[in-house]
């Protein structure tokens, strides 16, 4: 809509991505702040709360009854803000909206299964969830490939591509999207723990897609120039605004959880932005907290299956620190600090190449 105003009413300031990114940020923020209290009241009335895992640390029992599925609100706000401010004839914007929508639907189904009175109180089975995720990721990766998105693989701090992936890029992109989606999902175990690292990651990724989409900046900073990709910075800005508003309600003690309907699309969209920005490997630094949490689970499960011994007191690793006696707030803030530092390191790749 705002770009239409520029085209038809000649409001020139609205042609700039930076301006529309700022507008999308505030639209998503205000919309989430307005809708979230209404959603929380509705969810409490419907008793839409996720059961607490029986093996969770004892202090988690007080979280019983906290509404879940808050992700529906901030994903909805992000999409609305994007529709109002971005060019809807932009291929990458359409792909971003599709990514959020598809993975949000998977999360909604999983959350609904958990809070309903069905026998499957654990939600979708891990196998079914993974199948749906790979099907959605395959659709997105396939569309990117058919559109002609570059399949060159770049590494941080090096200006030349490592190699051309060709059609195998589809498989690689699928794993980036699904892996990122599940990594954020695993991290979402404490109040606000996944929210702030997500805000930081989307801020960094928004800068990166803006750079690769800008011919002058991409050339100066020795990045590949991905035409029209810069428009995705508007969508990244919108999701940051929505998440900051969500943090108002999700900070400790949380009034609402994002649920799988929030964490799955967040992670998938992170992967999508990294693919578009040709920063798939750099995503390991951008989302270091999410990687750390995922690796802790892999090590725990692998060690127990191979040696019948556990590496950590409990996995994901934030539960390990809880079992060691760390207070929830201390764990959360320390993880935020690590996320902040890892994103600063990732941003160094803009200049050091």
Curated annotation (Swiss-Prot):
GO terms for biological process: cell division; cell wall organization; peptidoglycan biosynthetic process; regulation of cell shape. GO terms for molecular function: metal ion binding; phospho-N-acetylmuramoyl-pentapeptide-transferase activity; UDP-N-acetylmuramoyl-L-alanyl-D-glutamyl-meso-2,6-diaminopimelyl-D-alanyl-D-alanine:undecaprenyl-phosphate transferase activity. Keywords: Cell cycle, Cell division, Cell inner membrane, Cell membrane, Cell shape, Cell wall biogenesis/degradation, Magnesium, Membrane, Metal-binding, Peptidoglycan synthesis, Transferase, Transmembrane, Transmembrane helix. Pathway: Cell wall biogenesis; peptidoglycan biosynthesis. The chain crosses the membrane at residues 16-36, 64-84, 88-108, 130-150, 160-180, 198-218, 228-248, 256-276, 281-301, 330-350. Its EC number is 2.7.8.13. It is an enzyme of class 2 (transferase). Pfam families: Glycos_transf_4 (PF00953), MraY_sig1 (PF10555). The keyword Transmembrane applies. It is a multi-pass membrane protein. InterPro entries: Glycosyl_transferase_4, PNAcMuramoyl-5peptid_Trfase, PNAcMuramoyl-5peptid_Trfase_CS. It catalyses: UDP-N-acetyl-alpha-D-muramoyl-L-alanyl-gamma-D-glutamyl-meso-2,6-diaminopimeloyl-D-alanyl-D-alanine + di-trans,octa-cis-undecaprenyl phosphate = di-trans,octa-cis-undecaprenyl diphospho-N-acetyl-alpha-D-muramoyl-L-alanyl-D-glutamyl-meso-2,6-diaminopimeloyl-D-alanyl-D-alanine + UMP. Catalyzes the initial step of the lipid cycle reactions in the biosynthesis of the cell wall peptidoglycan: transfers peptidoglycan precursor phospho-MurNAc-pentapeptide from UDP-MurNAc-pentapeptide onto the lipid carrier undecaprenyl phosphate, yielding undecaprenyl-pyrophosphoryl-MurNAc-pentapeptide, known as lipid I. Belongs to the glycosyltransferase 4 family. MraY subfamily. This is Phospho-N-acetylmuramoyl-pentapeptide-transferase. It comes from Aliarcobacter butzleri (strain RM4018). The lineage of its organism: Bacteria, Pseudomonadati, Campylobacterota, Epsilonproteobacteria, Campylobacterales.
């Amino acid at each position: 809509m705002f770009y239409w105003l520029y085209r038809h009413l000649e409001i020139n300031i609205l042609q700039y991505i930076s301006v529309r990114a700022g507008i999308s940020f505030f639209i998503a923020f205000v919309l989430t702040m307005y809708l979230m209290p209404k959603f929380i009241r509705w969810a409490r009335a419907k008793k839409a709360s996720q059961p607490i895992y029986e093996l969770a640390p004892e202090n988690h029992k007080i979280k019983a009854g906290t509404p879940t599925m808050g992700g529906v609100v901030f994903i909805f706000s992000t999409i609305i803000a994007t529709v109002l401010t971005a060019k809807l004839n932009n291929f990458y914007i359409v792909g971003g909206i599709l990514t959020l929508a598809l993975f949000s639907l998977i999360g909604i189904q999983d959350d609904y299964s958990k809070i309903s009175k069905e026998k499957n109180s654990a939600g979708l089975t891990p196998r079914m969830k993974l199948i749906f995720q790979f099907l959605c990721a395959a659709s997105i990766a396939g569309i990117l490939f058919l559109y002609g998105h570059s399949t060159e693989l770049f590494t941080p701090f090096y200006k030349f591509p490592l190699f051309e992936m060709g059609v195998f890029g589809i498989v690689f992109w699928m794993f980036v999207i699904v892996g990122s989606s599940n990594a954020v999902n695993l991290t979402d175990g404490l109040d606000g723990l996944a929210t702030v690292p997500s805000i930081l990651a989307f801020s960094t990724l928004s800068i990166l897609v803006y750079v690769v989409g800008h011919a002058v900046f991409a050339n100066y900073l020795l990045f590949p120039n991905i035409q029209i990709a810069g428009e995705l910075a508007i969508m990244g800005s919108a999701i940051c605004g929505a998440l900051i508003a969500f943090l108002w309600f999700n900070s400790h003690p949380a009034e609402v959880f994002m649920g799988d309907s929030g964490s799955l699309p967040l992670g998938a969209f992170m992967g999508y932005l990294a693919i578009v920005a040709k920063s798939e490997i750099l995503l390991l630094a951008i989302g270091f907290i999410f990687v750390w949490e995922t690796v802790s689970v892999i090590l725990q499960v692998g060690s127990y299956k191979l040696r019948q011994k556990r590496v950590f007191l409990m996995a994901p690793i934030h539960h390990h620190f809880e079992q060691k006696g760390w207070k929830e707030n201390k764990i959360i803030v320390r993880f935020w600090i690590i996320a902040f530092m890892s994103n600063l390191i990732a941003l160094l790749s803009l200049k050091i190449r």
